[in-house]
Every structure is written in C-alpha cells, then in structure tokens.
C-alpha cells in the first residue's frame, strides 16, 4: 500500500498507551481500597470492578454527554464510580471520589509511549508525508501528554478537541485537519484505535481508515464499515 500525502494520527492508545485494558488497572486499584470497600476476597473485588466498569460504559454510551465530559475526565470518572458503588449499596461519595482520583493518577503515571511511535512518525515525515495529530479531550491534559512524550515538533498540525471546539467523530474535525495540511481526503489516512472515530467517520469523507488493533480485539460485531487496513504495530505503516 503506497504512502499517502498525509496521515492523521490519534493520540491516546495509538501513539501512547493511556486507557487500554482498564480491567487489570481497576483490579489493582480496588485491592488497595479493599478494606474501605469491605471487599475481602477476589470475588468481592470483582463485583466492585464489574459494577464500576458497567456504570462507566453506560455513562459514556450517551454521545452528547460523552462530548461534554471528555473535556473533564476526572469529574466524569468520579460520577461513574459513585454510580458503581451505589449500585452495590455503598453511597459513600467521598470514598468513591478518592477511588476515582486514585485511578486517574495511577493511569496518568502509567502512560507509556508505544515503542515504535517516534520511529514510525519520523519515517513518515522523512518520506515527505504531511502529519497531523488529531485528539479528543481537554487541551491542558492533551498538551501535557504531547510535551511529555516529545511529540509536538513531529507534526505539521496538532488539533485538540478542547482547543478546536469539536471532537471526533464530527466530520468537521477531519475536514479542518485536512484543510490545514492542504490535502484532499482521498490522499490521506486516519490511524487510530477507535473504530467509529478512526475508521467509520473518516471513510465517510473518502479517507483511508486504518485501525490500530494491538490487542487483536478484532472488528466489532456491529461494524458496518470495513477498515482499509488493520495494523497491530505502528511500524507496519512504513514497512
């Protein structure tokens, strides 16, 4: 597959590992709070984890609410943890908030750059491909990640939901990035881990939607669009 004129990259769980596989992270954290939760064995911890994660999924399933709360993840997490504990009969909101804040801090401390991220982006740039970083989320949080992992100077255009005013999968987001790169949709790839945001929406504009699937989750059962390509490593883009 020949290289395009431009590549738009997602940030979270594409260039950096940020929020993937939350099950293991929640289990680790809930063990720390086991005594406060009166959860004294693995089965009790699992009940709390399931309740918290199911409430989080329900919380984020509302597209309009998600667009609002993506700009304030810590508060959103507090609300969903409160709901998860309340479902189990625990209405201690102060405890729920401490758990949510601890999870936010733990995830922040565990952000990692994918090992082939810099090399892949640099190889594309060296090949003359124009590059944009297009990410949802709050400006301050995303800018901190970009600086922390030395990504800023590697892109011709950086577009953050909290600064631009709209986030993926709004088509205006991709159109604006393409305009800034002065490239037509048919000459561009969108690369990322979110099926709706990096495959379905970009393909509506005529872009190639390249799905990054490092954990081999497979195409979602409900998918109505097929990825232009599936990669398990970023380096596959330039191999």
Across the structure, where does each feature detected by a protein language model lie?
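Short amphipathic alpha-helical segments at helix boundaries and their inter-helical linkers
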Residues: 57-68, 107-115, 204, 208
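Active-site neighborhood of HAD-like aspartate-dependent phosphohydrolases
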Residues: 1-53
